[in-house]
Structures are given as structure tokens and as C-alpha cells.
Amino acid sequence: TDSVSTSSTPYTISAVADKTVLKADGTSLSYVECTVVDENGNMVPDADNLVKFAVSGKASIVGVDNGKQESAELYKYDNVDKSSYSERMAYNGKVLVILKSEKEAGDALLTISSDNLKPVQVALKVTENGTGDAPKAAEVTGTEKSVDAVNVTVPTGMSVTLPSVVKVNYTGSAGDYSLLKKVTWSEVKDGKAEGTIEGSKLTAQATITESDDAATDV
């Protein structure tokens, strides 16, 4: 029987390159299809994150696209023929980046990132004749660093609704990044609450302030 998987909070980007070994001729292309996915690898079809691309080594970026015909975004970032950086909004959860080899053999590394998503890297190899073993897949690792504190002001005497997610910050092998994670809060006591974060060893902290001024806000 067919089953349908539903996506949840965007977590990272799945990146698939049609080629990971390019010829060092300055014209060989690799098309890297990027998909915003949740923690279970399911596509998030309504994701419209601004996706950022940075490449180092013996390749450059020559184009980005998201399939949205009415988009006013540039196919070539900053209108330059090739660059080491580009960016594009995802459309229906997807975005494409096109890499081109340089004329020198060597390695290349593409880093793909977006706010509140775990970054991903794609390793490529540029060889004299365009053949050879594919490079080892690049794996991004991260270590929890901190949780953004939650501060809420409510009208005096009113109950408070705390956010369902908090921002957890990481130090990673591809640079620092942040993820939004679900949180379950304790009861508010003396204007404070602690949160248990799903999939995290850290604890969230919330401070609730009552204000007569807040009661007059519209």
C-alpha cells in the first residue's frame, strides 16, 4: 500500500550533484539540485528559504535557478559570469546551483546554507581528463553551543503563551549555524519557566514580565 509522509519543521538541505568529478577544461558543469527537508529527510514543499552558496577550490558558480518563471532574481548573482558566492530563494522547497570547473586540477567544496537550517557541503574533484574516483562525501558536524533566551511581556494579570520552538545555536565544521527546535515548557513560576528541547541536551529559559503598559497596547 502507498503511504504518505508529511513534512515538519525545515531542518537541512538535501544536495544532489549530477557530477562530482569534472574535467579541468574550464567548461565542465555540475548541476546541484537542493531540496529543503525536515529531520526525517522529507521535502518541505512550501519552503521559501534564502539559500546561500559558497564554493572554494577549483570550481566556480555560474548560475542559480529555482524554476519560478516570474522570479525577478538574477540567474547570475551580481550579474557576473562566475563567482565564489551566490544565493537564491527556494521555490516549492527547491533550488538549483550550477558549478563550472576551472582549468586547473584539484578539489572543490560547495557549502550550502540558510538561516535556521543545518548547512550541507558537496565535495567535487576536478581532474585533467574528467575521470577518476568520486570524492568522499563531505559530512557537516555540529556541537550545541547555546539556546536563545525567550523574553515575553504580557499585560498585568493575563496568562502567557510561550513559543512552541526555540533557537538552538551550534558550532559546526562548516561554520556556526542555528536550528529551530520544539520545546515543552514547565509551569511559569515567579516569572520564569524552563523548557525541555526536543533532541537537545540544553535547557531553554523563559522570562515573563507583567506590565501595565502592555495592557494598553493595541
Protein language model regions, located:
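Short, hydrophobic beta-strand segments
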Residues: 80-103
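Proline/serine/threonine-rich low-complexity linkers at boundaries of modular beta-sandwich domains
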Residues: 2-12, 132-145
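Short, solvent-exposed loop/linker segments at the N-terminal edge
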Residues: 21-30, 150-160
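Carbohydrate-binding surfaces of carbohydrate-active enzymes
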Residues: 1-10, 14-24, 37-39, 47-49
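Edge beta-strands of extracellular beta-sandwich domains
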Residues: 2-7, 118-127, 216-218
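Beta-strand-rich structural segments
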Residues: 27-45, 51, 110-112, 162-172
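Serine/threonine-rich, repeat-prone extracellular segments and beta-strand-based repeat modules
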Residues: 173-218
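Short aromatic-acidic-glycine turn motif
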Residues: 10-14, 53-76, 130-135
